[in-house]
């Protein structure tokens, strides 16, 4: 077993997280995050519609395709949106340069967002930036926009590390038939807000500059494809289970679950000194129930002085998920291999407990999981993988 204790130095720079909103929907999402005081990130808005962009609250604003569109928008044509982004490629590159992680948000199916998102993602990847897109999909009754959105999604997938899709059709199902349009779209924006805030909380400490190993975040989210994100909050007895159930059961995401997840990032936040080892164990057991045998799981525990002592907040981001109807590809040589026994299988799990003093990291081998004395020596909960629905 490897045990490392690092004391963070105040001179260490935290990871730089930027969020860029594209088109009308993406720019509205930026306004929502600014209004909700999401900290630790830099906001950028880019649009072909000059009038709409002028009203945006992002610190950095980019007018796309001034020569092409004259500030009048892309007219729901993604080809124009793409060309506009190419016209201002240098401005986009300058705005996102220096980021360790970039969130791209937009509403797919229109002109500016659908066309420019793949361009922005391609630029980000060329700069070595961890790139995650959080996008909405049109209502099924929107006809042509649905097909335009799907074509845009296929292009976007080629360049992003992880992709979170929020279908508009889920909004009424999840929120009820009486929900207003404003409330529904705000709920969709909040998925992005929670994802950004959750990652920011994992990577930075508000009271002291502590940079949790950003390489761990990259391990979970790099080149992983479809992803899901959820956040849960609970108080009182059984708070850990209730918050975890909320986090993994987001009704707004696109028919994805933790089943078969290959990468999971878990962040647990409580008041100082209020997280129990048994709660940490319970959270991780729930997460591991449906995971892939080769799961990469990273978890952090943060302390927030503003939270009550009986409260807990849990953020979970799972990556490497299958889309609805997708089937895993299994190479022929793997079919002939002898499957390891249940006792031999283990997950690569790293734990990081963050306090105002520093970071404690522990790496467990497969043998360590079967050696209770090793776990007891370091007061680590027995986080054991449970095979779920093995016949599936």
Curated annotation (Swiss-Prot):
Which UniProt key words apply to this protein? Cell cycle, Cell division, Cytoplasm, GTP-binding, Nucleotide-binding, Septation
Q: Which superkingdom?
A: Bacteria
Where is it predominantly found?
cytoplasm
Entry's Gene Ontology BP terms: cell division; division septum assembly; FtsZ-dependent cytokinesis; protein polymerization
Recorded GO MF terms = GTP binding; GTPase activity
Subcellular locations according to the entry: Cytoplasm
Establish whether keyword GTP-binding is in the entry. yes
Q: Which family does it belong to?
A: Belongs to the FtsZ family.
Describe, as the record does, how this protein assembles with itself and its partners.
Homodimer. Polymerizes to form a dynamic ring structure in a strictly GTP-dependent manner. Interacts directly with several other division proteins.
The entry's function note states: Essential cell division protein that forms a contractile ring structure (Z ring) at the future cell division site. The regulation of the ring assembly controls the timing and the location of cell division. One of the functions of the FtsZ ring is to recruit other cell division proteins to the septum to produce a new cell wall between the dividing cells. Binds GTP and shows GTPase activity.
What is the protein's given name?
Cell division protein FtsZ
The source organism is Neisseria meningitidis serogroup B (strain ATCC BAA-335 / MC58)
């Amino acid at each position: 077993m490897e045990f490392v204790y690092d004391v963070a130095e105040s001179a260490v720079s935290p990871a730089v997280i930027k969020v860029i909103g594209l088109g009308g929907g993406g720019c509205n999402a930026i306004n929502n995050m600014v209004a909700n005081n999401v900290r630790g990130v830099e906001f950028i808005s880019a649009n072909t519609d000059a009038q709409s962009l002028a009203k945006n609250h992002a610190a950095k604003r980019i007018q796309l395709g001034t020569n092409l569109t004259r500030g009048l928008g892309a007219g729901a044509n993604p080809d124009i949106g793409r060309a506009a982004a190419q016209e201002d490629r240098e401005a986009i590159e300058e705005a996102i340069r220096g980021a360790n992680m970039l969130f791209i948000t937009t509403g797919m199916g229109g002109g500016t967002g659908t066309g420019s998102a793949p361009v922005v993602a391609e630029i980000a990847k060329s700069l070595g930036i961890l790139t995650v897109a959080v996008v909405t999909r049109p209502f099924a009754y929107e006809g042509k926009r649905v097909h335009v959105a799907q074509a845009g999604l296929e292009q976007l997938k080629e360049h992003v590390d992880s992709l979170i899709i929020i279908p508009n059709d889920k909004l009424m199902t999840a929120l009820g038939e009486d929900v207003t349009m404003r409330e529904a779209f705000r709920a969709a924006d909040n998925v992005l807000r929670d994802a950004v805030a959750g990652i920011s909380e994992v990577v930075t400490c508000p009271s002291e500059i502590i940079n949790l190993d950003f390489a761990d975040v990259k391990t979970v989210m790099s080149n992983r494809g479809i992803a899901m994100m959820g956040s849960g909050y609970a108080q009182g007895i059984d708070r850990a289970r209730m918050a975890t159930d909320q986090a993994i059961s987001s009704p707004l995401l696109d028919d994805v679950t933790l089943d078969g997840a290959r990468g999971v990032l878990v962040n647990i936040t409580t008041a100082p000194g209020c997280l129990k080892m048994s709660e940490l164990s319970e959270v991780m057991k729930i997460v591991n129930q449906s995971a892939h045998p080769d799961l990469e799981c990273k978890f952090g525990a943060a302390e927030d002085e503003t939270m009550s002592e009986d409260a807990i907040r849990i953020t979970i981001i799972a990556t490497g998920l299958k889309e609805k109807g997708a089937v895993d590809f299994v190479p022929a040589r793997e079919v002939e291999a002898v499957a390891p026994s249940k006792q031999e299988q283990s997950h690569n799990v790293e734990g990081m407990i963050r306090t105002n003093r520093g970071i404690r990291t522990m790496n467990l081998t497969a043998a360590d999981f079967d050696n209770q004395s090793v776990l007891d020596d370091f007061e680590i909960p027995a986080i054991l993988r449970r095979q779920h629905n093995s016949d599936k």
